[in-house]
Regions:
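Short conserved catalytic/interaction loops centered on acidic-Pro-aromatic/His motifs
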Residues: 79-82, 433-437, 477
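Alpha-helical elements of the RecA-like P-loop NTPase motor core of helicases
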Residues: 64, 419, 477
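Short, amphipathic C-terminal "tail helix"
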Residues: 474-487
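C-terminal substrate-recognition regions of SAM-dependent nucleic acid methyltransferases
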Residues: 164, 168, 246-473
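SAM-dependent methyltransferase catalytic region
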Residues: 1-239, 245-249, 254, 258, ...
């Protein structure tokens, strides 16, 4: 209910003084307080203010909180104006109005929310042959009151308010939409659906939208490429508040990549006020969200990436393999005999090179393989707030291959180059750049799009890389404060 009654700061939880509140009902009651001469006059027009404030919510617990906040808002404005608390008999009619004006409704069907009926076996009949539609069970309409009709208002079905219009109009849309639907991948490959809600909401042309959603859309998410492009290019997003660790918002829920909430305003066009919360510290900056094809959540990191990309060097997303580098799934197992060795999630074993159709050019090379899963659970940092990013990393000799469990990070003709490359991947510098894209536990070749390629005939250290890209002491400290050292 913050748009209706802004009693407290949504970020800090602190109460906001009545004079500084900006909710819809707050603004109406402020006008009443500024103009009413007597208490009776104040109560009369304050009642009209409550009567003209409407809203609906799908979830019952959210509805209860909204109703309570509106009632307390009325009481607090009365006390601020007349220096007394309202009596119970004064609050009763206001509570009645609020119970009518804030109601529970399924906005897609304009009906009382109900459980989805169990599917039944379809029985074909004569009429179905000709395309006759079977009757659908009726929905239960929601009733609201028109307080201008009758001494106590007149109840009417909500859909009649639209007066023949086929689309609803909203001042504000606020909520926490469903995040994903399972596609049989145990959550790892579930399909996001919050993007569909946002796209549908925008078609109603509301005055403002405020939704809390997973933050993985910044750089990943199944099927979110078009959505990400549209969001990053949308200059109507006035505010974006980002929590790197979802446990800061939902103490019992790990949301891979963190969560965020944004405010979209139809009347706004400009840079976005972006705030990131990490380890209890807030960082705020006004930013163009589409600086890169993916969104970098940390402003300092954004400046580091700009420096790294200045020279236009080849990046490792052109070097790292795709999934199944040798065409073998995670379930691939060794054979009884073979002329090469398979590295799989259960160890090592023989395999026949004649069975390999993909990546054959790498079989005779020295290869660095890394696990497709990051070292972090659900993308969350360790207790010290630092990230390791890369977990398993191994050197495969010629005639050694791997299953889909791993990515081939690079393949070389000499052991020296491969070893230098492995040391490069272990630097805090490289793993920091990977982290800016790999926000969840899944790694792909795209996760390496910010990592520049080097001359691997020599060894690289963090000190050399910091100097090469002219990073300031503040930027170096920032990287070292975020990324664990790796032996």
């Amino acid at each position: 209910a913050p748009f209706l009654a802004s009693r407290y700061d949504a970020a800090t939880g602190e109460m906001i003084p009545v004079a500084r509140r900006i909710g819809i009902l707050d603004r109406k009651l402020r006008v009443v307080s500024e103009n009413a001469v007597t208490e009776d006059e104040w109560r009369k027009y304050a009642t009209h203010a409550v009567q003209s404030t409407y809203g609906y919510e799908y979830q019952g617990d959210n509805l209860l909180l909204a109703r309570v906040n509106l009632l307390l808002t009325y009481a607090e404005h009365l006390q601020a104006r007349w220096q007394r608390k309202p009596a119970k008999e004064e609050l009763q009619p206001i509570a009645n109005i609020i119970s009518w004006n804030l109601w529970q409704m399924d906005g897609l069907h304009l009906s009382v929310p109900g459980g989805k009926p169990q599917p039944e076996a379809e029985q074909l009949d004569l009429f179905s042959i000709f395309g006759a539609a079977e009757p659908q069970p009726p929905t239960v309409s929601c009733k609201v009151k028109n307080w201008r009709k009758g001494s106590h208002g007149t109840a009417q079905n909500f859909e009649t308010i639209q007066e023949g219009s086929t689309s609803m109009k909203f001042d504000y849309v606020i909520g926490n939409p469903p995040y994903q639907i399972s596609d049989g991948g145990a959550g790892v490959s579930a399909t996001p659906i919050y993007n569909r809600f946002i796209e549908a909401i925008k078609t109603t042309h509301p005055g403002a939208i405020c939704l809390i959603i997973p933050a993985k859309w910044y750089s990943g998410g199944k099927g979110l490429d078009k959505f990400r492009e549209e969001m990053l290019g949308d200059r109507h997003i006035s505010t974006l508040v980002d929590y790197s660790n979802s446990l800061d918002v939902f103490p019992n829920v790990d949301v891979a990549g963190g969560v965020c909430y944004f405010v979209w305003k139809e009347a706004y066009n400009g840079k976005c006020k972006y705030t990131n919360y990490r380890n209890g510290k807030a960082t705020t900056a006004y930013r163009d969200l589409n600086e890169f094809q993916t969104f970098i959540r940390y402003p300092v990191a954004s400046e580091i990436v700009k420096k790294v990309k200045e020279d236009g060097e080849l990046t490792l997303d052109k070097v790292v393999s795709s999934r199944k580098p040798f065409g073998l799934a995670t379930t691939a197992k060794p054979m009884k005999t073979g002329d090469i060795t398979l590295r799989y999630n259960g160890g090592r074993g023989p395999y026949k090179s004649t069975e390999i159709r993909v990546g054959t050019e790498m079989i005779d090379q020295w290869k660095i393989i890394i696990s497709r899963l990051t070292a972090e659970h659900a993308g969350q940092p360790a207790k010290d707030g630092k990230y390791r990013v890369l977990s398993t990393m191994e050197l495969l000799k010629p005639d050694e291959i791997c299953s889909e469990t791993y990515l081939v990070a690079g393949a070389f003709d000499s052991k020296e180059e491969a070893t230098n490359y492995m040391d490069y991947l272990k630097t805090q510098f490289v793993r920091f750049l990977i982290l800016q894209i790999a926000m969840t536990q899944q790694l792909s070749k795209a996760s390496f799009a910010f990592v520049p390629c080097q001359d691997f005939s020599r060894k690289w250290t963090d000190k050399q890389l910091f100097e090469k890209y002219d990073l300031s002491s503040e930027e170096v400290n920032y990287i070292q404060g975020m990324i664990k050292e790796m032996a």
